[in-house]
């Protein structure tokens, strides 16, 4: 599977598409161009024997994957790990206003200005009475994987692993059922995030003092955004939509004043991040459950093999309930 991103309903015809038609990202055009370039580059490098920086990163990641035996038939690394550093698409996220729920998403062109994003959001919100937000994608499992070119080195490694894992899982039931429902989407994204962080940490062993300082800043943001999500959920559960939206706006302004660059916080913002159980914006508890399963499966490849053939969320729950120690850990 070439295409892997948070778009559970984008294969369906949706009236929203008509209103963003001029800004839709052309996946097929991108693939044709970049697969052609990939083949040409591979041939040129074979002739020159001079690997570039991307090749070096690919080799480092591939070695870590092989070391953990995340292989097809326990022998082959597939697909071959390849990525491209470039501008990534934007994504339009839709949620109802009375709850936080991802109901629709579609990729938009890369170079949208803030004003253009706001025009799209306002237009969709007024027309369909929904919450909408346009966000920048942090990576996407095209082939080669597309990773933002302005990312720092550690994030390039983490996000490249993340997108390769989507490609790997697409060969199995887990990845093939990512869009079955929001629970399967969240399971896929949370699992891939969990594994990619572990593999990236194995590669980036040496932490600097600046990383520790940054961690304190991240913890401050995490605490504030979790608080925002909790209060918002509570207000929406009481159908206090206007109050919830005013609260999210005030929290966005507060975070901006503290130096965090967030353009917009709304229901759609939280709906997007809710698929990623390792983020502070999410309230799904899948990550803690995955960690419980991991305690019984110390080797990463054994852990992956236990989960890769899940084709619906009830099978994941069966795994949680089938072992007494895992069940105790979860509860």
Task: Please state what every model-predicted region is.
Residues 30, 37, 163-169, 226-230, ...:
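Generic structural signal for well-ordered, non-membrane alpha-helices
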Residues 53-212:
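Acidic/His-rich structured neighborhood in mature extracellular/periplasmic domains
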Residues 3, 25, 30, 73-78, ...:
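Phenylalanine-focused residue identity feature
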Residues 1-71, 293-331:
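N-terminal low-structure segments adjacent to metalloprotease catalytic domains
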Residues 214-331:
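Pan-zinc metallopeptidase signature
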Residues 5-15, 186-240:
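Metalloprotease/metallohydrolase-associated module, dominated by Zn2+-dependent proteases
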Residues 6, 45, 50, 110, ...:
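Residue-identity detector for glutamine
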């Amino acid at each position: 599977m070439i295409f892997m991103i948070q778009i559970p309903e984008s294969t369906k015809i949706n009236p929203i598409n008509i209103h963003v038609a001029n800004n839709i990202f052309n996946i097929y055009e991108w693939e044709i161009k970049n697969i052609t370039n990939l083949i040409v580059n591979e041939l040129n490098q074979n002739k020159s024997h001079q690997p570039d920086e991307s090749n070096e990163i690919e080799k480092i990641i591939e070695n870590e994957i092989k070391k953990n035996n995340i292989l097809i038939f326990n022998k082959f690394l597939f697909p071959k790990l390849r990525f491209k550093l470039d501008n990534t698409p934007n994504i339009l996220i839709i949620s109802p206003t009375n709850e936080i729920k991802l109901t629709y998403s579609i990729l938009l062109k890369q170079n949208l200005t803030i004003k253009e994003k706001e025009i799209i959001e306002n237009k969709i919100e007024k027309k369909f009475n929904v919450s909408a937000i346009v966000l920048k994608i942090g990576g996407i499992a095209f082939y080669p994987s597309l990773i933002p070119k302005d990312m720092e080195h550690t994030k390039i490694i983490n996000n490249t692993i993340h997108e390769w894992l989507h490609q790997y899982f697409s060969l199995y039931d887990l990845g093939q059922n990512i869009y079955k429902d929001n629970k399967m989407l969240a399971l896929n994204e949370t699992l891939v995030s969990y594994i990619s962080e572990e593999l990236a940490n194995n590669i980036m062993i040496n932490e600097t003092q600046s990383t520790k300082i940054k961690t304190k800043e991240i913890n401050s943001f995490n605490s504030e955004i979790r608080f925002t999500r909790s209060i918002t959920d509570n207000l929406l559960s009481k159908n206090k939509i206007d109050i919830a939206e005013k609260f999210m706006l005030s929290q966005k302004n507060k975070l901006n004043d503290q130096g965090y660059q967030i353009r917009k916080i709304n229901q759609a913002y939280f709906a997007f991040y809710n698929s990623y159980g390792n983020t502070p914006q999410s309230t799904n508890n899948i990550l803690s459950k995955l960690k419980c399963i991991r305690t019984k499966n110390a080797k990463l490849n054994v852990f992956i093999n236990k989960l890769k053939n899940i084709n619906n969320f009830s099978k994941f729950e069966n795994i949680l309930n089938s072992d007494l120690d895992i069940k105790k850990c979860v509860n």
